[in-house]
Amino acid sequence: MSKPNTPPLPLTAKPVYLAAHAINTLVRTLPVGTAYFIGIVLITMFTGQLVHHQGSLARAALPYVRHLRWGWHRVERALERGKVSLDALFERAFTWCLTCLPVEPVRLGSERRTVPALDSSTVVRLRANKKRSALMGKGYCHRAQRAVQANLVAALTTVVLICGVRVGLVRRTRFGATCQEAVAKVFADLPQSSEQRLFSVDAGIATIEQFQAATARDALGGRLRKNVPLRRAPHPKPPGQRGRPAQPGPVVHPGAQRPEGRPDEDTTLRIGEREVRVRRWRNLHFREAPRTLIDVVRVDDPASKRPLVIGTTARAVTTAEIRVAYGHRWPIEPNFFVAQGTRAMEMPRAWSATAVERRISLALLAGSLLKAIAAACAPLPMGPWDWKAVSSAGRLANHLALQAGNFAALALQDLAPRTYRKITNAKETTEVQLPLAA
């Protein structure tokens, strides 16, 4: 049987240059003694070698620091003690993506709101010593089907379009003893922005306190619990009328099988062969927060077992745009999967608070950058048999691993480790106070 006469797949070196330029841009602003070794940490994450060595940073970095004395130790020390600001790295990576990649921010509504997405993840640490490990908390493990000790991280991403592909660029990471604590830390330290934003979150994050903290500039939209009770807003009183304050309206359960009252909007959409019913209630509020008005959208899709209930404080956004805003939340979840599968986020092998925070945060940063670069480049085939290649972070990591020598040389260009000069002519002095003899 003869082989088909087909032309060979073209190979491109553009991803190698883009990834190397990204690393070089990130570490160039760091101190001289730290930049070189933090660049090596990012190289091991970009090429997937950290996963190959089961999270051992010393073994993954050894081929790049073999020529240095105690090279692997200096890599570990730079990660744990180096002067590195994670927030500054995130902002520099975001600026690099806007400058070097065809990035188009996602905007919704007449107010042109950008869409940041926020979610949390549980990094299980079953074998870690509780007394030795830092930033430990309790989180639910789906594999063990119980609550276990873990590092709980919350990540904030900005959803953008790169060549038509939705990508989440990591902007902040925070840790806590619980997911609620980590999420609260992210909301307390949001990146500054002159634009109006609509934060897309999930059910565990869309709490009453977060809806109360939302503002007109930074609105909140997220999935609500199925059994959440809400109230209709009271009818406005005529101006100048005195008397007792107006009583709130009747109770509404938007997630119930038969919600009370009539919705303000009730439409039916045709998606493929399914008929999806979409209902909207305006000017609802929680019993504990009568001054915080929200709009609630319920989506009944035959393909899902439970209805999707979405609440938002951005009441000027249309019903279709609310559904789209919640759909933009999914790019943050692949960031966790990419960081776990190819950046060894689930195997941090770190114990101090600084090392744990930097290992997990840099893994999320490397994963989001790889996804962004892969979306901007042509699909990378794994071999001559791969005729349906796609642009993914895993394929890009495999391509960078094949070009590891050139990739490392480009990423560490104009960077060199600090050399420590050994003092050969040390002068002994007798002025140093000696300890008292026993």
Listing of model-derived features with the role each one plays in the protein:
Residues 2-82, 86:
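Gly/serine-rich nucleotide phosphate-binding loop at the start of the catalytic core
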Residues 345-402:
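Basic, amphipathic alpha-helical segments enriched in Lys/Arg and hydrophobic/aromatic residues
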